[in-house]
Every structure is written in C-alpha cells, then in structure tokens.
Regions:
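S1/OB-fold single-stranded RNA-binding interface
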Residues: 46-52, 56-147
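OB-fold/S1-family RNA-binding modules
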Residues: 1-68, 130-253
Length: 253
C-alpha cells in the first residue's frame, strides 16, 4: 500500500529527514504484521511510503494521524479546515497558495486571495511586503478554511483559519524575536545551537510542523545573531527572521 503523507522532506537535509521518518515508522510497526518497503518523496516533496502486510490499513491510519494525510479532490468540503503548507510564495502577486495534500491533481493547491489576506491581517500593503514581514514563506505550516471549490477548473479558494491569525497576533505582540528554521529536525537544531554556544540564548524551541521550528529568542538576544551563528552550520536550510518591532512599525505606517 502506497501512502502519501502531508509532511514534507526537502532541502539540503532531505535524506536525513527521510531517515528520521523511516526510523519512526520502523519503531511503530515493530509488533505489527507490516513491512516498510520504501520511503521517498513526490514532486511536491510530500513523503511517500510503501507498506505491505496484514496490518497495512491500520498502519496507514496511524501514519495519517501522526504525519497528516493526503486527499482526493472529490473528498474536499467547503467551510472545512484543512492543514497545509505554503508553496510557491512570491511567484504570483494575487495571493498565496497552500498545499493541502490533494494528490489526484497537481494544480489543486488552495489559493488565499490577496484581498482576503489583507482583510484578515488588517493590512493594505503589497503582497510581497506582507509575506516578507510576516514570514509567510514556503513550507510554513498553516490551517485554511475552504471557501470555494471548483473542481472543473481545478480551483480552490480559501481563507486563513483563526489559529493562523491568532499565531500571527501572538507573535506580533510578543517582545521576543524569532528565527524560523525549516527543513531540519530538532536534534540537528539543538546540536548546532550548542556547538555555536547559543543554546542558552533561546528561550523556547516551538515546533510548527514535523521539520519546521520557531526559535524564540530571549529578550536580550537578537534573532539575526542566532542566524549568523547557526546559518553556516546548517547550509541550505531555509531560515527566516520574525522581528515584532518591524512588523508593528509596518502596521502603524
């Protein structure tokens, strides 16, 4: 049985991330009649595993619960919340696309239109300014509510779930700067922080997705300093600065 998960493995450490998942699945199926035949990714970097055995259906359900599940377009429902990740940020100016895991059509990402983004974030800035300031970047996990489903034209429209807006507001009014790190596991991040002598400068490591993390800096620590320290040690790993003061200045401009 081939299973496509919502979790993605990507970037310079794609192989290591796949090995992380392989190890976790191997532990999961130790006492079951199931064998992990293969693990890899599809064209959108979603993890694809092949499981065989009497318990493959049980394992499939367990994997979907742990790592998120893929969908068929016919199963989509309006006014329903779906988890996903931003894709192709910056490639168009009319909105942001979110990969919610539809696997039977390569072009069925959910579009959050620019007017809806402006309305929900209470901003009138250009899309590029909004995405850069709020770090709405590729691979950032988000939840969206589907508002319109047009299967004939392969078009889905959505808006951000309140969880996303609440997270943005929480970060915005928090006086801790953040460094977002995508495409690494927590052990890697912890290790690089310790080697660079900066683990004590991080107040909290928040897990946003399986391989997506927010490093919440101590009040006396600048996120740019952490980026300079661990960036060279994790080459090829996307990292983004979230600076509340800069965002507030933008909102008040």
């Amino acid at each position: 049985m081939k299973i496509t998960l919502l979790t993605k493995a990507y970037g310079a450490y794609r192989g290591r991330l796949l090995e992380t998942i392989r190890s976790e699945i191997s532990i999961m199926i130790t006492e079951l009649d199931a064998t992990l035949i293969s693990i890899g990714t599809d064209r959108k970097n979603r993890i694809v595993v092949n499981i065989e055995g009497e318990d493959e259906e049980f394992v499939s359900n367990a994997l979907a619960k742990e790592y998120g599940k893929s969908l068929l377009s016919d199963d989509l429902s309006p006014n329903t919340v779906y988890p996903g990740r931003f894709v192709d940020v910056g490639k168009v100016g009319y909105g942001l696309y979110v990969d919610i895991g539809v696997i039977d059509s390569p072009k069925m990402d959910a579009l959050v239109p620019l007017h809806k983004i402006r309305e929900q974030l209470n901003l009138l800035a250009p899309l590029k300014s909004i995405t850069e300031a709020f770090v709405l970047a590729d691979y950032l996990p988000v939840e969206v509510i589907l508002t319109n489903i047009d299967l004939y034209n392969n078009r889905i429209e959505a808006e951000f779930d309140q969880k996303v807006i609440a997270r943005v507001k929480e970060w915005l009014h928090d006086d801790h700067e953040r460094l977002l790190v995508f495409g690494a596991n927590q052990r890697q991040i912890e290790g690089k922080l310790k080697k660079s002598g900066h683990r004590e400068d991080i107040y909290e490591i928040e897990q946003l997705g399986k391989f997506e993390f927010s490093l919440r800096c101590k009040r006396s620590t600048r996120a740019s300093g952490i980026l300079a320290a661990i960036g060279p040690r994790l080459r090829g790993v996307p990292m983004h600065l979230f600076i509340p003061k800069e965002l507030l200045a933008m909102q008040n401009a």
